Design a protein with these regions (language model features):
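Surface-exposed loop and membrane-interface regions of Gram-negative outer-membrane beta-barrel proteins
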Residues: 69-106, 111-123
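Transmembrane beta-strand segments of Gram-negative outer membrane beta-barrel proteins
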Residues: 27-41
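Outer-membrane beta-barrel "beta-signal"
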Residues: 210-215, 247-263
């Protein structure tokens, strides 16, 4: 759904004269509301399956002001029960920030505060500060970003190796001029700090998406460099027989397919 708070202008022809009042251009909407709903073959976050390698359903809504400020809500079904990545069955993200072009450089800045909420496992709630820069070069778009989770209760609850976490990433996407509905995208990220999936690791994504009207189909290969050996030695969440294998299974390379409807 997209709501635009604008006033429409009408063209009026006067029969008694040759003058014509032309329709005014619609002004930029003050506020836009957009949303989406998706079905995914599994929910991966920074390379790690958050849905026990099983399908998930997701939805999002964003309210944005034309000045660049925005607030968003995002939700997904997720792992629960005996899964070693147990986040209580549901994840709800709330985040807000500001995005704006930097002068005439062609670079766009985006930054804000991101909260991760797990109603079924509240000890896992945490927040991050985030920032990114992106720029288009013809059919290519390059983006780099940083997410920082400062000292907070999450790190005390799960006794991570440090009381903060840093995530750095870079992305390159390509949309051919003759087929703009197609996007080929790549992503490489690095996690280091208190999130005890492992002391640190890399995650990667290579995929392609195709947009038709309000539908987007995406097929990607997603994975990490977490091996079965460092899964056994890194001090992951969870313990007991098979824990290391289950974490490795959640982190190993897999194909992920999604279908998203935007409104």
């Amino acid at each position: 759904m997209k709501i635009k708070f604008v006033c429409a202008a009408a063209a009026v022809a006067f029969a008694c004269s040759s003058q014509v009042a032309f329709a005014e251009d619609a002004p930029t909407p003050e506020i836009t509301v957009t949303g989406s709903a998706a079905v995914v073959s599994q929910y991966r976050f920074r390379g790690i399956s958050q849905s026990d390698n099983k399908p998930a359903v997701q939805a999002a809504i964003t309210v944005a002001d034309k000045s660049g400020f925005y607030v968003s809500f995002w939700g997904s079904s997720a792992s629960a029960g005996q899964s070693q990545v147990n986040i209580g069955g549901t994840e709800i993200d709330v985040y807000g920030g500001y995005t704006h072009a930097i002068g005439k450089t062609g670079i766009t800045f985006d930054g804000g505060l991101y909260g991760y909420l797990y109603p079924g496992a509240p000890a896992g709630n945490y927040f991050e500060l985030y920032g990114s820069l992106s720029k288009a070069y013809g059919p290519f778009t390059v983006k780099g970003g940083l997410n920082w989770a400062p000292d907070q209760g999450y790190f005390d609850a799960y006794q991570g190796i440090s009381h903060y976490n840093m995530y750095e990433y870079g992305e390159i996407s390509f949309s051919p001029a003759k087929l703009p509905a197609l996007t080929i995208h790549t992503h490489l990220g690095h996690t280091g700090g208190g999130f005890n999936y492992t002391k640190e690791y890399l995650d990667y994504t290579v995929g392609a998406s195709y947009k038709w009207k309000n539908l987007t189909l995406d097929a990607s290969v997603v994975g990490t460099n977490v091996s079965s050996d460092n899964a056994s030695n890194a001090g992951f969440i969870g313990s007991g027989p098979g824990s290391a294998y289950e974490i490795y299974r959640a982190a190993k390379t897999a194909g992920v397919v999604s279908l998203t409807a935007s409104f």
